[in-house]
A protein has these predicted regions:
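Nucleotide-state sensing region of NTPase/ATPase domains
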Residues: 1-21, 25-37, 92-96, 125, ...
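Generic secondary-structure boundary/loop-capping signal
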Residues: 4, 11-12, 34, 52, ...
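Long, non-coiled-coil amphipathic alpha-helical linker/lever segments
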Residues: 26, 33-84
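Alpha-helix initiation/capping motif
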Residues: 14-15, 40, 122, 146
């Protein structure tokens, strides 16, 4: 199987774009190396949409069905968070090897679930997610969307020495940071001989 990875013009403006673009960039990299990740994202989106549809026509007879969907949503959500966490861990290790060429960088995720997963077992994070989904039902009905979700996170990059957010750097400096992330990703691919990926720009 040969996967493809596209580097589009707006990639060079990643840290000037919105969080959805940065999250999509991260998810695209992970999907290139983990065939299950894209399926998990798809399943997560499917259950998220299904939950909103049911909540919009809510009645007490649907409570058990909503609980079942929320359980699925929380389960896939934690799997996605964990995959992102593990991938960033590898990227950060590779970024350290480029510190003599590029700025010393640390990549992080801003999401509440992402941060919780760094210090708590996955089962506890899943339970926390379930509680948030239950607490937010009325709010989600009113707004017609899932207000607490793994798709609310943002990819952050910091200069390790100054702890300056990449979004504060100049356009030229941001492009250097983006290239260093891509080189780190390529290094990750080189360490896995089972992966066949074609890059397009």
């Amino acid at each position: 199987i040969i996967n493809t990875f596209w580097i589009v013009p707006k990639t060079t403006f990643l840290f000037q774009n919105n969080s959805e673009d940065r999250r999509g960039f991260l998810d695209h990299m992970i999907s290139s190396v983990d065939s299950d990740y894209k399926k998990n994202l798809s399943n997560y989106d499917k259950f998220k949409s299904e939950r909103i549809k049911i909540l919009k026509r809510w009645n007490n007879n649907q409570l058990e069905w909503v609980k079942l969907i929320e359980k699925k949503l929380a389960s896939y959500g934690v799997i996605i968070c964990d995959a992102r966490r593990n991938f960033l861990k590898e990227l950060n290790q590779n970024l350290n090897t480029f510190s003599s060429i590029f700025p010393s960088l640390q990549l992080e995720l801003s999401g509440e679930l992402d941060k919780l997963l760094l210090k708590s077992p996955a089962v506890e994070v899943e339970d926390f997610f379930l509680r948030k989904l239950e607490e937010n039902r009325n709010k989600d009905i009113l707004m017609g969307k899932t207000n607490f979700s793994v798709n609310k996170t943002d990819l952050l990059a910091f200069d390790i020495d100054s702890m300056t957010d990449a979004r504060s750097f100049s356009t030229g400096e941001q492009k250097i940071i983006i290239f260093s992330i891509i080189f780190s990703f390529i290094k990750l691919l080189e360490s896995n001989s089972n992966l066949n990926i074609i890059f397009f720009s």
